[in-house]
Amino acid sequence: MLTKFETKSNRVKGLSFHPKRPWILASLHSGVIQLWDYRMGTLIDRFDEHEGPVRGVHFHNSQPLFVSGGDDYKIKVWNYKTHRCLFTLLGHLDYIRTVQFHHENPWIVSASDDQTIRIWNWQSRTCISVLTGHNHYVMCASFHPKEDLVVSASLDQTVRVWDIGALKKKSASPADDLMRFSQMNSDLFGGVDAIVKYVLEGHDRGVNWASFHPTLPLIVSGADDRQVKLWRMNETKAWEVDTLRGHMNNVSSVMFHAKQDIIVSNSEDKSIRVWDATKRTGIQTFRREHDRFWILAVHPEINLLAAGHDNGMIVFKLERERPAFALSGDSLFYAKDRFLRYYEYSTQKDSQVIPIRRPGTPSLNQSPRTLSYSPTENAVLICSDLDGGSYELYIIPKDSVGRSDVVQDAKRGTGGSAVFIARNRFAVLEKSTSQVLVKNLKNEVVKKSSLPIPTDAIFYAGTGNLLCRSEDKVVIFDLQQRLVLGELQTPFVRYVVWSNDMESVALLSKHTIIIASKKLVLQCTLHETIRVKSGAWDDNGVFIYTTLNHIKYCLPNGDSGIIRTLDVPIYITKVSGNTIFCLDRDGKNRAITINATEYIFKLALLRKKYDHVMSMIKNSQLCGQAMIAYLQQKGFPEVALHFVEDERIRFNLALESGNISVAVASATEINEKDHWYRLGVEALRQGNSRIVEFAYQQTKNFERLSFLYLITGNLDKLSKLMKIAEVKNNVMGQFHNALYLGDVKERVKILENAGHLPLAYITASVHGLTDIAERLAIELGDNVPSLPEGKTPSLLMPPSPIMCGGDWPLLRVMKGIFEGGLESANRGAVDEEEEDVEGDWGEGLDKFDVDGMENTDIEAILDGAEAGEEEDDEEGGWGLDLDLPPELDTPKASANARSSTFVTPPQGMPVSQIWSQKSSLAAEQAAAGSFDTAMRLLHRQLGIKNFAPLKSMFLDLFSGSHSYLRAFSSSPVVPLAIERGWSESSSPNVRGPPALVFDFSQLEAKLKSGYKATTAGKLSEALRVFLSILQTIPLVVVESRREVDEVKELVIIVKEYVLGLQLELKRREMKDDPVRQQELAAYFTHCKLQTPHLRLAYFSAMTVCYKSKNMATAAHFARSLLDTNPTIESQARTARQVMQAAERNMTDATTLNYDFRNPFVICGSTYVPIYKGQKDVACPYCTARFVPSQEGNICSVCDLAVIGADASGLLCSASQVR
């Protein structure tokens, strides 16, 4: 049994499969009807209008309807699309056992405990016939799939077959009173429209179920006498064919399988039994421990069954439907219907090759599981689960393709798996011993090899190599050298798919796809909520795979997406261009055409084939929010711009890609304050002051505009802005602008007009405007404020602008392919808008709408000032001074024009970038400023995930490898890279590695200080020193292999000290728990410390145990202490005294979790011993050991790495990567 779906609920009494959709109805003893999607495993809906148990339920085969019958005597017809009951049919006088729709007519048949069967017309909502004759509860009634017959089963120990042919001749909807009267009579006494054709007697107790065969004139029944009976009928009679015995309790339900010659029954004995309908013998039995079975349902189209029991229901298959196949170049070999078949992709020709199983062999769940093909020897290995695992070897004659009469005796053997590993060699797995037998084509063993892990399946992994699968990992094993070439932790792998060049492999689990290299180096992992069924590599290195309901793709970086949906599951065999070749569950070859544009586009982006990307943008119909979001997420907003017409999205993408011109055009179309504000922020970031000015004008942000004019030295526009503030009666704005301009008279005037005469007087007096000050003093009279004495006034004037700046100078670079590629298509619209906008920027102040004034009044103010300026220019006559308007300061030169202006040379590659590209050491990446690369390297090499302790070290490395040269105040600081080992004779064209602030000698000095602190008993300080060393080591670089070994040795030394000091500090905290104190002190002695420190540990443990009356344990520590030949006499004397005291009473007062005779390591988190033979996990960096429950947590010893993570190992020298 292959369970596909299972639910937990109240007792399930009725089940019905939907004929087309992956749905199943389950009616419960609690009165609820559940609608489940068994493919997705989700509850779609529930219907709960019945009162009491619902025993019967059935889907209509074409309408969105289902019918239910319950213990409330009601039959309800429901519409599952509208989620409501359409109507209720009343007439039965007792519990309703089953209900069923007719396959053609608008009829429903129902069976009831009132000893009748009723046939209803659900369109006219009336009962059209009552079938009476049973004299006990009618447990079941169903229509024949083709003929006008009904079969019923009753507790009166009979099965009856009814002829309902006369019903078709009557009107389904009675109209007049006479017909209503006859209807009432038929309700009471039974009508003549349905007559009993056969009464089948043979059961000794009540019959619970009877059903027709879908095509043959057979009936099967199950009863309380624990028997299943098979009946045959013809036009005149029906008779018993055979009795199937085996159930130990009442048989609840029994049915014929829709596709195979088998009978399935279930019983209250908690079992489901499968019987061969031809041989009438039992084939398989499936049992549950606590659940009695009550109902069966068979899917009318596909190989699915369902069974309801006391605590829910299960949907299951009896055997696998995945065909076994093997690909070889342009051809496919696959097994179907006891034949090996051959399919050629180019011609799509399908033919039989040879028979592969003798007729008469039991076939249930013993079909071929895997198939392996050797093209050189034209040999096929077929594996199945027969006899616990077996294989058959066939040599295909060259002239047998297309012929199916060539019979040969296969060479057979037992084994869990069998695959070809060379031209004329194949490997067979012996599961019990985890051995591989290498055999030749004569089926003779030529070699035996033990596998490195307990293996339950083997797969081909290249010539002479095997991929071995265990429960939680896979390894690649070289049979010749007996070496493990690669290992990878995975969920349970079901299928293995190699790429065409054997460089990549896809490992398919139930819900996971793992892409790895040929050495099992992980590339990406993909998780699916729906079961993964198959997959194949296309020509571009993209993995195409199927789930139950989708064809999907997986790119090399792990990005995935849906190509198309599926109606039924398929098994991909090959992908060629836009065609997917696959096998369906019937073993038929199919070719499906797909649209590969989306994943080819993403692959081109991933591989940086930008010319290909541009070509696809121009020629393909790529669109959709998902594509835009993908491009944005992957850092290509400038590409996404080409797919977007919505101005708001275009604006966001333009800002993200820094495309100011497109952003201006979109902001002009949108014309909202928030968008202008964001445009101003981005333009300010780019130093484009003209667009910043324009954006501030559009938002009427006078304060920011004033400050912009101040910092760019544009005093003319600042004075115009002051006039506008005066017109708007904005006193604060006017005063600010006067302050920025240094216009004292204007400030005095503003203060006077605002009524602040004392402030105006002080301002005038301080700045030496005596005439104005005297006039104001007269107006103030006796209230003239006095100026402070004894202080020398200083003039507060803003500095005069030396450079009236425009936009920041930018390096001239070539336009990117995505910016210039579509210029011809988009130039017209965008450039026209841009030119219009640029024309307005020079005198953009005209745009303001001032409260209380017309635009023409403001323009008059501003135009007056400009007219005066123009007159002044004209008075110059024919002078050589030419004042150009701002718009013409930097004219646009034509493409071919020669310019005399200085063009900044293109910037070379920064040294930090050279460092980053050349180095694979994390410390040098951090020194180059590539922190993210450094973190990725540390994560891959050492499994480090917690980078907080390394943050300050990263910053130290970066700042220590750079120096900064300051020049003039107006010029930027010049960064200089400091190289390791630089000398005056070094070549200027060769860049050395960065200088590093951490080296191995520093760590050795720190180690000595840590030893000193430990000896002095300053344990907290010592722990801090050792932990600092442990966290610095990943960022140390050494030169030679010998130094690499010393660094690795230092990691172990420091790890032992950190763990030991943590144990001792923890012990000192636990003053209220003497048992735990003794345990921690005992564990401390098992840390590998220097001899002086080990003596201190022994002495401490001896003292603690002696005080707690654990004399035997104390004596052990005293003996260990004396074995180290202590140099301090007091320690030796105390140890001898303890041993003398212990000899008188060699017992322990308390039991400790400590056994010094059994070797162990200490868990670095829970501080408990992990004895030899127990499972543990390790920190990939410091190698500290932990109990398995700590896997996935941050290591508590080094505080850096993830416990149990995969890591390649410490890389601290360039010599390791040469």
From Swiss-Prot:
Compositionally skewed regions (Acidic residues) per UniProt: 831-843
Membrane-topology annotation of the record: Peripheral membrane protein
Region feature Disordered, mapped onto this chain: 826-849
Highest taxon above the source species: Eukaryota
PROSITE patterns membership: WD_REPEATS_1, WD_REPEATS_2, WD_REPEATS_REGION
GO BP field: endoplasmic reticulum to Golgi vesicle-mediated transport; intracellular protein transport
Xref: CDD domains: Coatomer_WDAD_alpha, WD40
InterPro entries, alphabetized: Beta-prop_COPA/B_2nd (IPR006692), Coatomer_alpha_WD-assoc_reg (IPR047312), Coatomer_asu (IPR016391), Coatomer_asu_C (IPR010714), Coatomer_complex_subunit (IPR050844), G-protein_beta_WD-40_rep (IPR020472), Haem_d1_sf (IPR011048), TPR_COPA_B (IPR056176)
Compartments in which it is found: Cytoplasm; Golgi apparatus membrane; Cytoplasmic vesicle, COPI-coated vesicle membrane
Main location: cytoplasm
Intervals holding WD repeats: 7-48, 49-88, 91-132, 133-172, 202-241, 246-285, 288-326, 363-404
Keywords (A to Z) from UniProt: Cytoplasm, Cytoplasmic vesicle, ER-Golgi transport, Golgi apparatus, Membrane, Protein transport, Repeat, Transport, WD repeat
GO cellular component terms listed in the entry, alphabetical order: COPI vesicle coat; Golgi membrane; mitochondrion
GO molecular function: structural molecule activity
Pfam family name, one: COPI_C
Summary of the function given for this chain in its UniProt record: The coatomer is a cytosolic protein complex that binds to dilysine motifs and reversibly associates with Golgi non-clathrin-coated vesicles, which further mediate biosynthetic protein transport from the ER, via the Golgi up to the trans Golgi network. Coatomer complex is required for budding from Golgi membranes, and is essential for the retrograde Golgi-to-ER transport of dilysine-tagged proteins.
Subunit structure: Oligomeric complex that consists of at least the alpha, beta, beta', gamma, delta, epsilon and zeta subunits.
Name of the protein described by the UniProt record: Coatomer subunit alpha-2
Organism encoding this protein: Arabidopsis thaliana
